[in-house]
Amino acid sequence: MKSLSFMFATLVLAGCQSVTHPPLTMAKQVDLPRFMGDWYVIANIPTFIEKGAHNAVESYRLDTDGSIDTTFTFRADAFDGKLKRHNPRGFVIEGTGNAQWGMRFIWPFKSDYRIMYLNADYTQTIIGREKRDYVWIMARSPSIADAEYQQLVALLHSEDYDVSKLQRVPQQW
């Protein structure tokens, strides 16, 4: 619980920074039922709890009330490291084409969560934040072609992300 509280405090303090970027580009429309399921984290600018993550997977399930039950699991520091699990809840922000959510780690606060990019076949996505402090490149499979990865990195660079902070997340299944 301490680490969850610290992560929340970090996200809140990060939200206090002044914004000097243009608005973050988001996916035009997200079909929520199609977006649900498992997403492997290919790379990220990690939060403090994700540093050293291996086999990171974010799983989404649409609840009957319209909220999104989220499970984030990974192994700490190695493929055989301690299994870590976090269960934030997502809330779609109306008028965003389902591309912007508030992600609640601790009630009543919600963190910014934006689906910046989603390919047509729903196999690759980028989740970002307006502050450009954290980002997640995710896919339906544990790996993607290097050329595809470089295209996603270029997209992040065009959105004013500091891509030098981007870290590949080891996946071995």
What is the meaning of each model-derived region?
Residues 1-5:
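Positively charged n-region of N-terminal signal peptides that target proteins for export
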Residues 16-173:
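A beta-rich soluble binding module of mature secreted/lumenal proteins
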